[in-house]
Amino acid sequence: MTHPGVYLSLRICWPISVDQPAAAAHLTENLNVAFELYQVRTGDGLKPLARNGLAAEGTREAVGIEIRQTIDLCRSEKGRVMRNNAQHLKLQFAKAWEDDGMARQEIRKFLHTYTSTLL
């Protein structure tokens, strides 16, 4: 379990502030590679979320129930699907950094644009 920073391998997101709620939403709603905890929210975070209407109770009991349910989901078919999705993303990232991959091509263009003038 971790905050959903973009450089971490995630499974269960506990978003706190700044970019973390958006990252958690992307990982859970768009990529389907992580679970997000809602009951850990406090303050304004207890309001219903615009994207799915879920509102947190924010109690210790609700947090405990949600964590146990999330662990069960990690072990379920839904968890298996998420692991498969994460594996697929891993392969896409690896392919992007191969010699002819998109990421490699883009970094070469960037370096050519901004370093060729320095030589």
Name each model feature, range by range.
Residues 1-119:
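Catalytic core of nucleotide-sugar-dependent glycosyltransferases
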